[in-house]
Amino acid sequence: MEPASSFDGMPVDVLIVEDDPIIALDFEDTIAGFGVKTIRTAANVARALSMIADRAPDFALLDVGLVHEKSFAVAERLQALNIPFAFVTGYGADTALPAAFAAKPRLPKPYSTDALRALLMSGDVRP
């Protein structure tokens, strides 16, 4: 599966997996400002996996630490589908990731708009 992108290099459909509704809304607003057409959010792993099964995104942002769970099952599914993704964490570069994801990009919280834009447009995030 090849991710779609708009003429400006932005993905067309972004999935945000984030359990904090304020942070999720902030991501939505910022990403919408980049011209992304479809932005979906999931607050837990089960919902994210269901959304991916219904319609795979072109890119995903995964909060590492969700309430009572980690987002690694979502990362595994995205990687199997060859969909680019990045981890978002408030714990910095020291956040332990499974070896399979150690090289995946990370976006720190709080994030800068420029860093988020570059991440979404970067060819480096493709698995």
How should these model regions be labeled?
Residues D63:
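Active-site residues of response regulator receiver
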Residues E18:
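Conserved acidic carboxylate
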Residues N44, H68-A73:
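Acidic catalytic/metal-coordinating carboxylates
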